[in-house]
């Protein structure tokens, strides 16, 4: 099949020439596409959401200007930020960033955020499918890594569903609401790549 043809991957159609894909869930219809500079305000609103922010390792009050600059600048090859959009509202985002160090270029880190009212409705799963399809089939990343708060059971279950395995426990990893919290490190290997031992 020519590379420009759409193909079914994990229940979602992916075509490199398409800029977005529509997803319909029982009570939600949204699109997933690459983030653009004009999405900066929506991404900031998502990150500021109380249900989202507590699980992120970021400082409060992200600025739209800083995010717009990030989205406007040339990123490293392979880096991507996808957004889930419902009626103009950014309801979720997933980012994948490769490591720039020579001996770690086979690894990428990712982060996921879904707004409270869209959680447990398939948005996180749809974003994960899109990101994994991109990482496995269009990049040379061998492993995808993440760090998650140790008490974020919903996120951990989602990551395990997509093949991530726990690799370690980081004690007192991050400050959340004035307390130091533990985190887990998890990783997933690209099944299409040969693993050199």
Identify what each model region corresponds to.
Residues 1-20:
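Positively charged N-terminal leader segments that act as targeting/secretion signals
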Residues 16-38, 184, 190-197:
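Conserved N-terminal entry element of GNAT/NAT acetyltransferase domains
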Residues 121, 125, 150-168:
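Conserved active-site alpha-helix within GNAT-family acetyltransferase domains
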Residues 136-147:
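Conserved GNAT acetyl-CoA-binding A-motif
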Residues 146-156, 173-177:
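Conserved beta-strand-loop-alpha-helix junction that forms the acyl-donor binding cleft
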């Amino acid at each position: 099949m020519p590379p420009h043809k759409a193909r079914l991957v994990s229940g979602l159609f992916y075509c490199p020439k398409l800029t977005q894909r529509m997803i319909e869930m029982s009570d939600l219809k949204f699109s997933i596409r690459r983030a653009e500079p004009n999405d900066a305000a929506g991404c900031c609103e998502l990150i500021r959401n109380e249900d989202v922010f507590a699980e992120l390792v970021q400082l409060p009050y992200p600025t739209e200007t800083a995010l717009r600059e990030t989205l406007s600048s040339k990123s490293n090859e392979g880096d991507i930020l996808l957004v889930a959009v419902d009626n103009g509202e950014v309801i979720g985002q997933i980012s994948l960033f490769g490591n720039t160090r020579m001996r770690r270029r086979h690894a990428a880190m990712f982060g996921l955020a879904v707004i409270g009212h869209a959680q447990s409705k398939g948005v996180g799963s749809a974003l994960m499918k899109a990101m994994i399809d991109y990482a496995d089939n269009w990049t040379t990343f061998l492993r995808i890594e993440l760090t998650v708060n140790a008490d974020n059971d919903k996120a951990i279950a989602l990551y395990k569903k997509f093949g991530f395995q726990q690799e370690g426990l980081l004690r007192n990893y991050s400050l959340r609401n004035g307390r130091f919290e533990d985190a887990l490190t998890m990783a997933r290997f690209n099944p299409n790549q040969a693993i050199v031992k």
